Design a protein with these regions (language model features):
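N-terminal glycine-rich phosphate-binding loop and ensuing alpha1 helix
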Residues: 2-49
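A conserved hydrophobic position in a structured secondary element of the catalytic/binding core
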Residues: 50-51, 103, 184, 231
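Conserved alpha/beta core of the MobA/IspD/sugar-nucleotide pyrophosphorylase nucleotidyltransferase superfamily
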Residues: 170-243
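Conserved core of the sugar-phosphate nucleotidyltransferase
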Residues: 104-195
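Short phosphate-binding loop-to-helix
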Residues: 47, 53-96, 100-113
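Short, high-confidence coil segments that cap the C-terminus of an alpha-helix
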Residues: 43, 89-90, 117-121, 216
């Protein structure tokens, strides 16, 4: 199976501008993400996709592969699709978030394994090691799944809501945190970019809700590997503890 790893990276993040270029103990965040992805021997090619010259120059500086993309892309998925269109021989594309400096190659290979099943369109990761603070934090995305581990819904809110339950909600239900790494069959990735945005996607600010709304299945792969991401400046200190 030929697998393309793409790291979409933009400078103008609303919550943390310039995030890909922050220094994490001597290396930029984008370099740490790239190097983590390159550790997998099952990914044929790893490429950073950006529309910013500063990020482009940084990737070239540390010797990584990078492609400049259109500025008009509304999401990282669209940016990935543009790059993937140049690699028609790739069967699976992994969207490796540029804010995951601790990405573990074993997580990526768990996603690849999901495509052994011919019916898998999209796969993503989740883990069950949430704290109550995580459950209440809108920057920690929660997901609920069905009996076959396909996603039913993603939310920034605590789902399911436990207002009728007594005691600690975490003792009553195995809350799952979504880890924002995605893999797609190449043909499906190109289809996703043609879908119309939906009200659910807009109100939650979660593009994967568009795919669910339009009938695509998202397979959740449970991982026990802990990889804190950097969504806002306050997350940096937590990541530095792991380096």
């Amino acid at each position: 199976m030929k697998v393309l790893g793409i790291i979409p990276a933009r400078y103008a993040s609303s919550r943390f501008p310039g995030k890909p270029l922050i220094d994490l103990k001597g290396k930029s965040m984008i370099q740490r993400v790239y190097e983590g992805a390159k550790k997998s021997t099952r990914i044929s090619e790893v490429i950073v996709a950006t529309d910013d010259q500063r990020i482009f120059d940084e990737v070239q500086r540390f010797g990584g592969k990078v492609m400049m993309t259109k500025e008009s892309h509304p999401s990282g998925t669209d940016r990935c699709a543009e790059v993937a269109s140049h690699f028609p021989d790739m069967e699976v594309v992994i969207n490796i978030q540029g804010d995951e400096p601790l990405v573990d190659f074993r997580q990526l290979e768990q996603l690849i394994d999901a495509f052994i099943e011919p019916k898998t369109d999209i796969a993503t990761l989740g883990n069950l090691s949430l704290t109550q603070e995580d459950v209440d934090n809108p920057n920690r995305i929660k997901v609920v799944v069905n009996a076959k581990n396909s996603a039913l819904y993603f939310s920034r809110s605590a789902i399911p809501n436990s207002h009728h339950s007594k005691g600690n909600p975490l003792e009553n239900y195995p809350y799952m945190r979504h880890i924002g790494l995605y893999a797609y069959r190449s043909s499906v990735l190109q289809e996703l970019t043609k879908l119309e945005p939906t009200a659910l996607e807009k109100i939650e600010s979660l593009e994967q809700l568009r795919w669910l709304y339009h009938g695509y299945s998202i397979q959740l792969v449970e991982t026990t590997i802990e990889t804190p991401n950097i969504d806002v400046p306050e997350d940096v200190e937590k990541v530095l503890e792991f380096l």
